[in-house]
From Swiss-Prot:
GO terms for molecular function: cytochrome-c oxidase activity; heme binding; metal ion binding. Pathway: Energy metabolism; oxidative phosphorylation. Component of the cytochrome c oxidase (complex IV, CIV), a multisubunit enzyme composed of a catalytic core of 3 subunits and several supernumerary subunits. The complex exists as a monomer or a dimer and forms supercomplexes (SCs) in the inner mitochondrial membrane with ubiquinol-cytochrome c oxidoreductase (cytochrome b-c1 complex, complex III, CIII). Keywords: Copper, Electron transport, Heme, Iron, Magnesium, Membrane, Metal-binding, Mitochondrion, Mitochondrion inner membrane, Respiratory chain, Translocase, Transmembrane, Transmembrane helix, Transport. GO terms for biological process: electron transport coupled proton transport; mitochondrial electron transport, cytochrome c to oxygen. Belongs to the heme-copper respiratory oxidase family. The gene is COX1. This is Cytochrome c oxidase subunit 1. Its EC number is 7.1.1.9. It is found in: Mitochondrion inner membrane.
Length: 172
């Protein structure tokens, strides 16, 4: 439906998204993020698998909490479809909508934390080989943890609005 609306706006001069013709540009933003946001969460899943393989192999241990890691990856993929509007806190969403997207976004921190702590537990007490792939994986863990912590802050719609258009968001 969204692509049809966009194509008719561009080719047949309809005004689904043009406010001058009674359209709603916020609707376009919802449609954009509804597609674009889950994509990001799905695209990171193979990267998680690569990090798990590197950490496990170069620590000489099995992945800690393997079943929990699988469930965490599935829940991240599913929850990614439910949080698109956390990129839209400044467009005038009502309080109840912002509260839902705040809570749903914060919930993603749980499976993400499971993954981080499982990777750390996999390395703990292992025979770690400090070669380039492992150093990359450890750097990823550090940056992903910082991104996750700043993401929890930005999940709060009130703080997100205050921090909008700042380097804090860029750093996240």
């Amino acid at each position: 439906g969204a692509i049809t609306m966009l194509l008719t706006d561009r080719n047949f001069n309809t005004t689904f998204f043009d406010p001058a013709g009674g359209g709603d540009p916020i609707l376009y933003q919802h449609l954009f993020w509804f597609f674009g946001h889950p994509e990001v969460y799905i695209l990171i899943l193979p990267g998680f698998g690569i990090i798990s393989q590197i950490v496990s192999t170069l620590s000489g241990k099995q992945v800690f909490g393997y079943l929990g890691m699988v469930y965490a990856m599935i829940s991240i993929g599913v929850l990614g479809f439910m949080v698109w509007a956390h990129h839209m806190f400044t467009v005038g969403l009502d309080v109840d909508t912002r509260a839902y997207f705040t809570a749903a976004t914060m919930i993603i921190a749980v499976p993400t934390g499971i993954k981080i702590f499982s990777w750390i537990a996999t390395m703990w007490g292992g025979s770690i080989r400090s070669i380039t792939p492992m150093l990359f994986a450890v750097g990823f863990l550090f940056l992903f943890t910082i991104g996750g912590l700043t993401g929890i802050v930005l999940a709060n719609s009130g703080l997100d609005i205050a921090l909008h258009d700042t380097y804090y968001v860029v750093a996240h």
